[in-house]
């Protein structure tokens, strides 16, 4: 299939987990009814984002939130990239994205590899590592349309991860993310366009909607970028669902016109996966 429809769900996350789950399911179904074949949710879609919230809202996988995602993926017959949730496993906490197939099967469980530890004086300090542990594996899944690579938010800053995914054959990279009011306007779109251009892939980001009253204010602006580096769909900061047609023939044409994959000097440099 040369084209398929991707939808990104952007909504306000509340402190009430059941409300978040109900809203997510409602918007997923709306996207599917409008033709979406792959749907992605935001980072931390079932809980407020913050180190104090992660242990309180954490679940095992499978658990309440992921069981519901499995059901709605099966009901809608879609591939569902389940944003992320705080996950608890053996006394450790992770920021984890669960991906489900059209039959409700868990395809991939991506634990955020690069933890969001930053300190911008006078603007923002955040240390995910105060409560979270990093993941240590790559997350790729197959669809009838193309191969998809998954990262979470801060993972997008690391060009090596995107290149490894592209080398594995991914044509679409999806990053549920929640950039803030400092890094969002400066880097959110720039990073997506860079990753798309570097690797000649489609890049999509799904953010929570902006809640000015939250302790952590998300930038919003869920986005889809083409392998030409062009923004082809972009949300504002409010609740919405955006969609884009992912055109794999267009991707193939770009790779043929500017054949950087054949022109890399592997005799001089390489980015490769370490075997655990």
Swiss-Prot record:
GO annotation (BP), single: asparagine metabolic process
Residue positions of the active site: 43, 112, 153
Enzyme Commission code: 3.5.1.3
Lineage, broadest ranks: Eukaryota, Metazoa, Chordata, Craniata, Vertebrata
Assigned keywords, A-Z: Cytoplasm, Hydrolase
Locations listed in the record: Cytoplasm
EC top class, as a word: hydrolase
Catalytic activity: 2-oxoglutaramate + H2O = 2-oxoglutarate + NH4(+); 2-oxosuccinamate + H2O = oxaloacetate + NH4(+)
PANTHER family linked: NITRILASE-RELATED, OMEGA-AMIDASE NIT2
Domain CN hydrolase: 4-248
Binding partners and assembly: Homodimer.
CDD domains: nit
Keyword Amino-acid biosynthesis (UniProt): no
GO molecular function: 2-oxoglutaramate amidase activity; omega-amidase activity
The family this protein is said to belong to: Belongs to the carbon-nitrogen hydrolase superfamily. NIT1/NIT2 family.
Protein name in the entry: Omega-amidase NIT2-B
Function: Has omega-amidase activity. The role of omega-amidase is to remove potentially toxic intermediates by converting 2-oxoglutaramate and 2-oxosuccinamate to biologically useful 2-oxoglutarate and oxaloacetate, respectively.
Domain of life from the UniProt record: Eukaryota
Cellular component GO terms held in the UniProt record: mitochondrion
Species this chain originates from: Xenopus laevis (African clawed frog)
């Amino acid at each position: 299939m040369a084209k398929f429809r991707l939808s990104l769900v952007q909504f306000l996350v509340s402190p009430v987990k059941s409300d978040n789950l109900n809203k997510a399911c409602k918007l997923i179904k709306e996207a599917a009814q409008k033709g979406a074949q792959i749907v992605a949710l935001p980072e931390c879609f079932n809980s407020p984002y913050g180190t104090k919230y992660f242990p309180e809202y954490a679940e095992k996988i499978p658990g309440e939130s992921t069981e519901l995602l499995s059901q709605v993926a099966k009901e809608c017959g879609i591939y569902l990239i389940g944003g992320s949730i705080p996950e608890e496993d053996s006394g450790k906490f992770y920021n984890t994205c669960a991906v489900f197939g059209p039959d409700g099967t868990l395809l991939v469980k991506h634990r955020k590899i690069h933890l969001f530890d930053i300190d911008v004086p006078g603007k923002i300090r955040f240390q995910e590592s105060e409560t979270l542990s990093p993941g240590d594996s790559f997350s790729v899944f197959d669809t009838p349309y193309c191969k998809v690579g998954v990262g979470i938010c801060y993972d997008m800053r690391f060009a090596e991860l995107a290149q490894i995914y592209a080398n594995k054959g991914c044509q679409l990279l999806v990053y549920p993310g929640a950039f803030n009011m400092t890094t969002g306007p400066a880097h959110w779109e720039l990073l997506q366009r860079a990753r798309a251009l570097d690797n000649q892939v489609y890049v999509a980001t799904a953010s929570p909607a902006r809640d000015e009253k939250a302790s952590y204010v998300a930038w919003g602006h869920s986005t889809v970028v083409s392998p030409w580096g062009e923004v082809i769909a972009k949300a504002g900061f409010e609740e919405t669902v955006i969609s884009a047609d992912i055109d794999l023939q267009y991707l193939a044409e770009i790779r043929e016109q500017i054949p950087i994959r054949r022109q890399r000097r592997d005799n001089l440099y390489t980015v490769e996966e370490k075997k655990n």
